[in-house]
């Protein structure tokens, strides 16, 4: 059967179009400042994690990435277990790439860039937006090393496991 399309309102939603235009104008005006803030927070987060957690690896290019994107893999842990511990602390994160969010399988994107299955399975994706603060990044950097070590201490394959 043929479906006829009808406008919701006469006039074509002018108010919505004007609102979208204003939102785009504001976004462009704030884009450079927002990008600088996100990049600084992202870089602090990445460097803090890599410096404080042995056997951690940045996934993707160190600078040619979205300003708020931090994707890191940790050897000898399961990403899903880390997500549960982070969630209990109020830290929102995901494992793998955005393409596989919600899946227990390792990210096909991480596998395609050459990560072994067990490393891709230990990945963590943290996304920073304009509402995040330096204090929140500091909180993650304070808590994450202990959580990763806790999971490694339970891992039967972790070579540094405490006897």
Residue locations for each model-derived region?
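Predominant activation on well-ordered alpha-helical scaffold segments within soluble catalytic domains
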Residues: 15-25, 46, 50, 83, ...
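Conserved core segment of the aminotransferase class I/II
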Residues: 1-35
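Generic structural signal for well-ordered, non-membrane alpha-helical segments
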Residues: 13-17, 31-42, 79, 102, ...
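Conserved PLP-dependent catalytic core of the aminotransferase class-I/II
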Residues: 29-82
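Conserved C-terminal alpha-helix-loop-beta "cap" of PLP-dependent enzymes
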Residues: 70-125
């Amino acid at each position: 059967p043929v479906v006829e399309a009808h406008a919701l309102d006469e006039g074509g939603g002018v108010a919505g179009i004007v609102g979208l235009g204003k939102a785009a104008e504001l976004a462009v005006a704030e884009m450079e400042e927002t990008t600088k803030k996100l990049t600084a927070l992202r870089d602090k987060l990445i460097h803090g994690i890599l410096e404080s957690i042995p056997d951690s690896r940045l996934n993707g290019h160190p600078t040619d990435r979205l300003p708020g994107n931090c994707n890191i893999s940790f050897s000898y842990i399961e990403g899903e277990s880390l997500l549960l511990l982070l969630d209990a602390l109020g830290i929102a994160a995901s494992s793998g790439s955005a393409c596989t969010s919600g899946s227990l399988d390792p990210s096909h994107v991480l596998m395609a860039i050459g990560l072994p299955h067990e490393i891709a399975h230990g990945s963590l994706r943290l996304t920073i937006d304009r509402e995040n603060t330096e204090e929140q990044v500091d909180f993650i950097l304070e808590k994450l090393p202990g959580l990763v070590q806790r999971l490694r201490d339970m891992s039967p394959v972790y070579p540094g496991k405490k006897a």
